[in-house]
Curated annotation (Swiss-Prot):
The gene is MT-CYB. Component of the ubiquinol-cytochrome c reductase complex (complex III or cytochrome b-c1 complex) that is part of the mitochondrial respiratory chain. The b-c1 complex mediates electron transfer from ubiquinol to cytochrome c. Contributes to the generation of a proton gradient across the mitochondrial membrane that is then used for ATP synthesis. Keywords: Electron transport, Heme, Iron, Membrane, Metal-binding, Mitochondrion, Mitochondrion inner membrane, Respiratory chain, Transmembrane, Transmembrane helix, Transport, Ubiquinone. This is Cytochrome b. It is a multi-pass membrane protein.
Amino acid sequence: MTNLRKTHPLMNIINSSFIDLPAPSNISSWWNFGSLLGICLIVQILTGLFLAMHYTSDTMTAFSSVTHICRDVNYGWLIRYLHANGASMFFICLFLHVGRGLYYGSYMFLETWNTGVLLLFAVMATAFMGYVLPWGQMSFWGATVITNLLSAIPYIGSDLVEWIWGGFSVDKATLTRFFAFHFILPFIIAALAGVHLLFLHETGSNNPSGLCSDADKIPFHPYYTIKDILGVLLLILVLTSLVLFSPDLLGDPDNYTPANPLNTPPHIKPEWYFLFAYAILRSIPNKLGGVLALVLSILVLAVVPFLHTSKQRSMMFRPFSQCLFWILVADLLTLTWIGGQPVEHPFIIIGQLASILYFLLILVLMPITSLFENNLLKW
């Protein structure tokens, strides 16, 4: 008799995705982050669900409801900090996952890559709205500054901002709708992740060499299930260490002050995972230009497949491209650092140079270097 997991319509989908899936025999630990992102999403949805049971999306009670969760709810502090630091882990895994895709040429799977870019936008939108919910100083002013950027859109800008606010400033209506969107978006993200996997399984996984691995496939289970479980255990170890030893390490002290529209914090800045984009936004003196640069800093990923000029898919055998890739990583770290600094000399000029280098590397230097490496193959 044929195994039930192969005949049952539902079990067969799970079987062909996680058990009998033919996988390349040489994929490294850089391929673990997809499953880790899935775990992060599950953790975020579950902790978020329990937080939503006690949270109130009203400007008068939002801050005190979060305090109530931490003080009075059984293990509320644990749920709250798992959710807050889980977001940081989510973005660490996301950045490493995207970096892996860039390094090994996984972006050549166009549909998978584009759904991935869409997922990145959705996760960033969700995280931004989630940061507004505790209604601390940084929540309020972060929401005010970022939503205000839409006023740079010609003609409809100011109307659009008031429409999003639900009034003439960030207030009760804004908080309520942000809570509604923050609640629904993770489920949309889960659906998109399903589409992401669907497209991936149409082609099969890429591998470090970038070569076709059809001749040498192994079943996903037990080889990669065990490998993924190790990754999950390490993720849980880092997350729990962060939550139990220094839960506020990645947060902003200003968010422990209730929102006050009459008092602006000295340095308005988003969470650490948005600092690179925030630095790019600030480095352009023009408002509309800054907004465009901010959007393009992520949207530029969508054009990467069309800028692939190399005859090789992966960077594994391309030392010059590797060098540029690690310069890009260093540049992003520099931008992240600049985003958290005040707008003054020398940070302004460093931010502007790092922003120029970011776009220059992706749009110009990497494609040119790939062409140069193609010529080296002829020698």
